[in-house]
Amino acid sequence: MVLTLLLIICLALEVRSENEEGRLIEKLLGDYDKRIIPAKTLDHIIDVTLKLTLTNLISLNEKEEALTTNVWIEIQWNDYRLSWNTSEYEGIDLVRIPSELLWLPDVVLENNVDGQFEVAYYANVLVYNDGSMYWLPPAIYRSTCPIAVTYFPFDWQNCSLVFRSQTYNAHEVNLQLSAEEGEAVEWIHIDPEDFTENGEWTIRHRPAKKNYNWQLTKDDTDFQEIIFFLIIQRKPLFYIINIIAPCVLISSLVVLVYFLPAQAGGQKCTLSISVLLAQTIFLFLIAQKVPETSLNVPLIGKYLIFVMFVSMLIVMNCVIVLNVSLRTPNTHSLSEKIKHLFLGFLPKYLGMQLEPSEETPEKPQPRRRSSFGIMIKAEEYILKKPRSELMFEEQKDRHGLKRVNKMTSDIDIGTTVDLYKDLANFAPEIKSCVEACNFIAKSTKEQNDSGSENENWVLIGKVIDKACFWIALLLFSIGTLAIFLTGHFNQVPEFPFPGDPRKYVP
């Protein structure tokens, strides 16, 4: 019985309370016109305070230069028409009224990119008995954010959210930053429990300030604005693993062409051009990520262009080395200055030990010379003489010649005289045989000399190849370090505004 009585009393009080709140709302909205600004006089200015709470930095689209954020925007103002005496309504000092029924300061995001100026959801407005209005609607904003691509992917960006009154000027509405404990909240508020960390960007500074456009007058709606800044720094680990590291490793392969023989110019060019094509693909991937701007070139783009230039130089070097290595005495003459420079001077500083073949006669290197060239020379000589004069075996038998080492000791004087007569008669044939032998010996010597000079050209090609290897290695290493260290030293400033020693943090 007692419980039933208590339940009836509670229900009666709740119904009475609901009736009182309903009566209050009916009284407040009875003669209320939401189209009229709540100004007591013509010169009365409505103070509108703003506070931005960031819950999620969703993304930054570099290609479209658009920042997407999830925020709660806190707007406060005073509407004298919505005030009441709490004693007349059983102590009710707060009511919740749908925002569609009230006058709202039309504060919108000015620098949006999708045409959505308004909030995502029109929540109820908290109305206090003194006329104070508190509105906290959620919003997902896509605002413009000019991208500085110079140090991509070691960059930081300065994005902003600009809020203005769409129709009211400074004589009617005064935009201000929210205040707590008598101090302006000059920063974007972040609740650590509700904030979701972004995997690509880190928030370094989040100041807020009111800005005046002194080129205009207070009669212009663009004269005053509230700007919330987001200075964010990129986390480069993703790009280091997926773009920079593969690019550096592939680009370093171009230096390996110098470990191939100097005469393997075709294989060297093939490897260099393959690396060049791979770098072109990486450059295409970078172009798909950064905005299409001609103001700056991204850091990774500079590096790719640099290594492409180095690869092109290496291809040119391979062609030059191949041209030098295949030179012969018939096409090029090897001067003593060139021989001294490339076979005597440079090898000392390149760590090479070369000994030109003609400069070391005391230690002749074993050669494997083909007899085919000698046979060709002999045939050339045979073609110059009648065949009958060179067939010594038949002439020996036909004229009664005998080998001296087979002659016995019983040769008489007459035989000796006949022998001298026969030798005198056959002197031209013997002379021709000697000339043939001399011709073959001369041809063999010329072939050996030609082979020695060919070998010197090959050695010169090796020296050029080794010198270009060290040049390419130094150029590649220094260029890589210089370019990426430039990005490493691109740090976010300690203070958000130059010349202002405040960090704008709570």
Curated annotation (Swiss-Prot):
Seems not to be glycosylated on Asn-158. Glycans are attached at residue 85. It is a multi-pass membrane protein. Disulfide bonds join 145-159. It is found in: Postsynaptic cell membrane; Cell membrane. One of its GO terms (molecular function) is acetylcholine-gated monoatomic cation-selective channel activity. The keyword Lipid metabolism does not apply. PROSITE patterns: NEUROTR_ION_CHANNEL. Residues 325-466 are cytoplasmic. The chain crosses the membrane at residues 236-260, 269-287, 303-324, 467-490. It catalyses: K(+)(in) = K(+)(out); Na(+)(in) = Na(+)(out). The keyword Transcription does not apply. Keywords: Cell membrane, Disulfide bond, Glycoprotein, Ion channel, Ion transport, Ligand-gated ion channel, Membrane, Phosphoprotein, Postsynaptic cell membrane, Receptor, Signal, Synapse, Transmembrane, Transmembrane helix, Transport. One of its GO terms (cellular component) is postsynaptic membrane. Residues 1-17 form the signal peptide. Belongs to the ligand-gated ion channel (TC 1.A.9) family. Acetylcholine receptor (TC 1.A.9.1) subfamily. Gamma/CHRNG sub-subfamily. Pentamer of two alpha chains, and one each of the beta, delta, and gamma chains. After binding acetylcholine, the AChR responds by an extensive change in conformation that affects all subunits and leads to opening of an ion-conducting channel across the plasma membrane. This is Acetylcholine receptor subunit gamma. The gene is CHRNG.
